[in-house]
């Protein structure tokens, strides 16, 4: 009996050779150790043996099984090692070769300007508010003191989607929504984002452009607070040596309203002024529609075009360059903070 079992193990060893594949080895395992395998079938003989010989026979079978499994496992490991070495040869890396330089990306100039303003106002305690670009007429116009028959609506040639929805013409509806949500509590926010109007695209106009509006509402807010805020923002953006000039203007959502000019020195050393934004004290009607008592609360608001800032700050002469995705233009802003 022992010789028969040993011959089974020997027959397996005789079938092992270097040309076998992993599939061949699996087939051999099934042939010898499978449910109907050569060695497995020997187990049925144990029933015919005397009781005193059964333990010894069982031990022979187990030893043979371990031997067969070991032979197959060793050969599998050899094949796997060969395959791994072949793969490593294909993936050999010459560490003496110079490395490849990855092209550095850059932030879009409008992103740079937006992040700069956000960082500045967050440092002053403001929150950054967001809102939908597809807006309801109620928030875009009505809550900004622009009733359906208000003549100032003619100033907005808008992209209407339905009778009551449009692509927002300014980021003021973000303010309206925030006021409504705040339920009469003090707020200080900025609202940057894309806006849309039916302007023909040229060097100074675009049907899509970006704004950043600011809104502060609290008790005892004065025009002096607005002026100091505008001065601080102008100096942060354009330099500490700048000053501002306020000119009376008109906006339906503020009263009084002003246009804000920022000083600069021309090539002849002469101080000149350039208009950069509009601002004013929040109109009482806007406060009321937003859920605030104008006898208790006052506020100020301002709005500035982000393309306007980028054009002045980076000396860009055509607003269309912001939206053409021309890498020759965008690559100029690598490393700009």
UniProtKB/Swiss-Prot annotation:
It is found in: Cytoplasm. It catalyses: tRNA(Phe) + L-phenylalanine + ATP = L-phenylalanyl-tRNA(Phe) + AMP + diphosphate + H(+). Keywords: Aminoacyl-tRNA synthetase, ATP-binding, Cytoplasm, Ligase, Magnesium, Metal-binding, Nucleotide-binding, Protein biosynthesis. Its cofactor is Mg(2+). InterPro entries: aa-tRNA-synth_II, aa-tRNA-synth_II/BPL/LPL, Phe-tRNA-synth_IIc_asu, Phe-tRNA_ligase_II_N, Phe_tRNA_ligase_alpha1_bac, Phenylalanyl-tRNA_Synthase, tRNA-bd_arm. It holds the Pfam family tRNA-synt_2d. Binds 2 magnesium ions per tetramer. GO terms for molecular function: ATP binding; magnesium ion binding; phenylalanine-tRNA ligase activity; tRNA binding. One of its GO terms (cellular component) is cytoplasm. Its EC number is 6.1.1.20. GO terms for biological process: phenylalanyl-tRNA aminoacylation. Disulfide bonds: none annotated. HAMAP family: Phe_tRNA_synth_alpha1. Tetramer of two alpha and two beta subunits. Belongs to the class-II aminoacyl-tRNA synthetase family. Phe-tRNA synthetase alpha subunit type 1 subfamily. NCBIfam families: pheS. This is Phenylalanine--tRNA ligase alpha subunit. It comes from Acholeplasma laidlawii (strain PG-8A).
